[in-house]
Regions:
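PAS-associated C-terminal cap
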Residues: 1-11, 124-128, 137-152
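PAS/LOV-family and closely related PAS-like sensory domains
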Residues: 11-131
Length: 152
């Protein structure tokens, strides 16, 4: 992506923060660089507890394990992603080295939440992976409506 001005870092932060879709960005060392307001609302974890740390898994899981962005930033092959998201993920049809998945998170909200999430590598001008971005959307209402239709 080409940037029109020298303040693209500020613009990126503003873009991520203003995005109504929960968004996480991690660097190549797995440190959270961006945890937007929507992500704080979705997870109940404030950005101040995540930025600069490598424990993003705590917002989603009871035990230490990678989130999808961690796998993508490491260049893990599909077989490695399958270890964590078996039967729940697919390659992005739009972006190379990107994946999407749906999964249930029982600790979120009352009765848990279904999330649809995507993760993609971010590369520098030389093509090296320097970060990964993950977006998350609450699809619980849709999943419950689908289940209700199946029960009829």
């Amino acid at each position: 992506m080409q940037h029109a001005d020298e303040n693209h870092g500020i613009a990126l932060s503003q873009l991520v923060e203003g995005n109504p879709v929960a968004t996480i960005v991690i660097d190549a060392q797995h440190r959270v660089t961006h945890w937007n307001r929507a992500c704080s609302v979705l997870t109940g974890v404030p950005a101040a507890e995540m930025i600069g740390r490598s424990e993003q898994w705590r917002a989603f899981y009871d035990t230490a394990r990678p989130i999808m962005a961690d796998l993508v930033v490491d260049g893990v092959l599909e077989s490695g992603i399958d270890l964590y998201y078996h039967g729940k993920f697919s390659r992005s049809l739009l972006i190379d080295d990107a994946y999407e998945a749906e999964d249930f998170f029982p600790a979120f909200g009352e009765g848990g939440r279904w999330l649809f999430f995507t993760a993609a590598a971010l590369r520098n001008a030389e093509g090296e992976v320097i970060a990964a971005i993950e977006t998350l959307q609450d699809i619980t209402q849709r999943r419950r409506a689908e289940a209700a239709l199946r029960e009829k």
